[in-house]
Every structure is written in structure tokens, then in C-alpha cells.
Amino acid sequence: MQFADSRWLAKMVAAGACATVLSAAATAQDAPTADPATLKAQWERYTADAVANPVELAPMRVTEQATAADGATLRLVSLHPGVNRWHLVERVAPEGRAQSWHLENADAATWTLSLTKGDDPALLISGRGEASQCRPWAGETSELATAAGSGLPYAPVCGGKLFLRNKVAGSRTNREAVSDFLRKNVVFGDKLVNLIKGAFFEDAFLETAALGDGSGDNGDVVAALGQARLDRRPNMRTAMGLPVTGAPDGMEAGSWYAVEGQEGIFASVMQPGLIAQEILAERNGANWLDGVERNADVYLAAFDLGRFEIGYELGTDHPGLEWSSRPSRRGAEWNMAGPDGFSRADPLVRNGMLNPALLPRVAGAIAGGFKRDHGAFRFGDYAGFNRGHHYGFISNGVTFSRLIENLSTLYITTDGEIGMKLWQEADNEMIPRLAFARQNGVPLVQRDPETGASVPGDRVTSWGGGNWSGSAEAQLRTLRAGACLREAGGRQFLIYAYFSSVTPSAMARTFQAYDCDHAMLLDMNSPELTYMAVYRQNAAGDGLEADHLSRLMAESDPWAGGVRVPRFVTFSDNRDFIYLLRKE
């Protein structure tokens, strides 16, 4: 198994490096710390062939325990003090009955949690020069019991400083309860979200804009982003849903435009057939483009990461933790519930929704990657080792599926570093300081180490070897979405691209034209699964409205109260998502 050799971390722990990683984060927030011996033992468990649940894949966790006068045992597990978001409270009654609750910090930058000792243990919530005690498990009808019965994905406890994460059915939660809570407790409210299944047909969502003559003034183009490498730059009138400035006669292909009312967010459009011939003619790992994909509209959005934080949240159902049906299992693997040893998140709770306390800062959301069944290899060499290379993911410092070498990985560290790379075994050294990560397949483009040029990944032309999948009719050309990171002009950008009907080769050539450092596939086959929206306050000031990269995406936002309701951020969804928050 890929984590069998943990000698590097043993050396880290012996040298005190692992403890330093944790202590640095904990000291800044006055949080409890774990000793080096405990951290070493937890990492050794992390690297085991199989573990019982995702808590054991939180190697930086800190556990505090106290015994009450009645003999009950209380435990507080801070799952990653450097992230300071997720906490697990466990209570074991004197007769042995155990209960657990998954809590989320309403303000990780302010509040820290610890467990007091003595005959009447309590949660001690500290911050802003004050401290308060809370015993939400106490009483005949405890605060936690009331919160658990509320029907809310996030139910406030302890004076609203914490949320109880509740299990809900994605897109089927009690809408009235959620709507009422947001309206009363958040600046934006009265918004609901649902998931509407789309159809899967090759070219069903193909968009082709009419091309006009050259553009006029494009003064709103971001200087640092420049222009894509195209042979022609016609004006394009498209069905892109982001309102932009400076394009009354259409958007010039390959140029960038500021999105109206959204500082730090920019949009671009193009068609792969416009890409510079010097890129298209290269024999460096991409196929010739066919006539359909050459004329397929591509919509792109760029986020200036100097202005945004990135996070990642699991859906209520997807991606799953069980085995994919694609790779073959061997021997003892048939006795394992999933590739990491478990198939359920328990005792943690996946609720598929953004923490309500973050709503005032949310700027955008992007649908995540493949479902678990599609997120592993059926064919090629990668199907034959690393248990089929199931795509890994980390949320709030907890690994739900371990990161696997050879896969493209978007990651965010506890100190805010954002990266995208081909994961290697040596990169596991980063895991103690990862807050979020999502893997999805192999690279579309990477930097050539010798020339520095953006070039196609080495599996772009291999259908099975790249696990590129396709439409329901097994057509490689279909609606697809991908993302890349790019450094330009001293800035870092996350670029998301929606391709209305293309093969991986057209995606790679497009990301080359935009000079991306590393690009990866996300999801595919319908606007619902390739969803991307940016948010703004509605006219009434009591909720969010969404502008979608493609207008077709709006159809997966249901109607509620006569208006469309954005997904992910105001109601639980069964799919995972990446979100962007404006920095404070």
C-alpha cells in the first residue's frame, strides 16, 4: 500500500518537526496540543493498511478527556487544531452507552475549544479576551438533542459559537426549517437549493457562438492575465452567464474581462479551433481536434487568489468512501469496506453545505470531481496497483480518502498556500498541514521541467490510461470542466473552464493557450455536474443570487418563492464542491 513506508514521518517526529507544525498553529490560537509520542502513534495509524473510520485519518488530532461526578466520561477530539473547524464530542455514560456529536466552529479565527476537568466538565470556548463554558449534553432534554432534532444541516449550540452538523438527505432536507434559520441568523437568507438530474448525451450541451469582426476597446482585460495564444480573436456572443464590463458588442476571444460587481473575478471565452497553430500542430501528447470540438464554446472564469480563500466540502453522498467497481480487488481487500478500510464517515457527519457563518464572505462555488465509482481506474497500469488509484480528498484537515501518488491534486494548507500538482509519495510529508485537498485523475497540462512551457500531460491521449470516461454512449467528446492554477504578473489565479463538447486533447490545448501551470479534469456530462457560479447579494438584501458560468447551469438551481436558489451554499447537496471566500 502507498503509505507502507512511514520512516520519513518517524524522522520528523523524532526531530520534533511534526510537533512544531501543530504547535505553531495551536500557539497562535491558544489551542491544546498533542505530544510528539502521540503524534507519532497517530501517524503510524494513518499509514496502516486499513483503518476503522476517518477520525483515524486525522493524524494531527488532539484528544482531551474528563470524568464527571456521575462517572460519565467526556472526550473532546479537536480533529486538526491548525484548521480549528471540526471537533468531535463523545460521552460515555456510566452504564457504557456512548454518544457522539460532530461540532463545527462558527468562527475558527476567533474561538478555540478545550475541555475543562473536574466533576462537571464543560466545553471552554475562548477568544476575544473572553471565555465561556458550555455543557450542551446536559439536562433531561439537552441542547444537543434539540439541535439534532431541528432538521437543520447546521444547528447552532453554545450561544451560536458552535454548530452541530446533522445528517441530512442532500437536496431533500426540510426546506422550511433551513430557510427560516438562514433568514433569522445570516445576513443572506430565504434561499434554498436542490439538485436536478441532467441527461447524458454526446454534444447535447454543445454551444457555438456566432463570430464577428475584431473587437474595439478591451481596457478591462486584466493585465497580469494577458491574452490566450490564439491565431484569431473574433468577438463572440455566447450563452455565458457572467455579466462582464467593457464588452457591449461581445467578448473578444481569448481576452479577459472583469465580472460586474465582483472584484478579483474575471471571465474569458474562446473556441479550441482559434488556438494558435503552433500549439495545435505540436506532437507533444495531444490529438488533432475534430470539427465539432474546434467550434465548441469554452467559458472560463479566473479568480485572483490574492483576494480569496479556497475550501472544499463533501456532499452528503458523493464522493463515496466505498470501493469503486472499476479496479479488481485482491485477497484481503475483499474483507475491507473501502480502499482505506471504511465505507462510512461515522462518527463524522457529511452535510453537503457551506457553514452558514461563511455566507457573508462566499464569492463562488464549483462542483467537485467524479463520484467514487468513477474515481478509480478500470484499465491501464494504474488499475493494477495502489488499489486502482481511488481519488483522494481531505476536508477541514480530515482525510476521508487518502491522497494517492500519480494523481492531479488541488490542495490548500493550514497557512493558506494553494497548489495544484501531480501527487508523489514524498508529498505525503505535507499531509499534517493540509486543510483541504481534492484529486481527480491525471494532469491535462504541466510545466515542462526543461523549457518551462505548458505541455499536455503524458496520458491525455490514453482513454483508459487517463480514466477520461465519456458520455453514456462511451463517446470521449462530451461536456467537460476543468481547473488550473497559473502564476502571472506576481499573482496567482485559479482558472475554471467549462467546455461545451470536447475531448481531453481540446482541454489540454486550451489550458496551454492560457499558459496554465497545472490543469486537471473535474466533472463532466451535464451542466449540473460542471456547475460553477459566483454570488452577489440580492436586491432585497436578504439573500444570495447566482450568476452562472453557463446559463444552462441555472437549471439545477430550483425555484423557491419565485426566485432561483443557488446550490451548495444555502442548502445541502449530495455532490461535493469547492468554494471561494473573500479574504477578511
Question: Which residues does each predicted region cover?
Answer:
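Aspartyl protease catalytic domain
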Residues: L314, P319-S500, P504-Q512
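Conserved hydrophobic/aromatic beta-strand scaffold that supports enzyme active sites
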Residues: L300-A302, T409, G482, F577
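A short catalytic or substrate-binding loop motif that flags glycine-/basic-rich loops and adjacent residues
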Residues: G291-N295, S401-I404, A474-R477, V569-S572
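Bacterial N-terminal signal peptides that target proteins for export
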Residues: Q2-V13
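Zymogen propeptides
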Residues: Q29-T399
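Sec/Tat signal peptide C-region and signal peptidase I cleavage site
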Residues: A24-A28
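Bacterial N-terminal signal peptides
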Residues: K11-S23
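Extended C-terminal subregions enriched in glycine
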Residues: R438, L444-R447, S454-D458, W468-E584
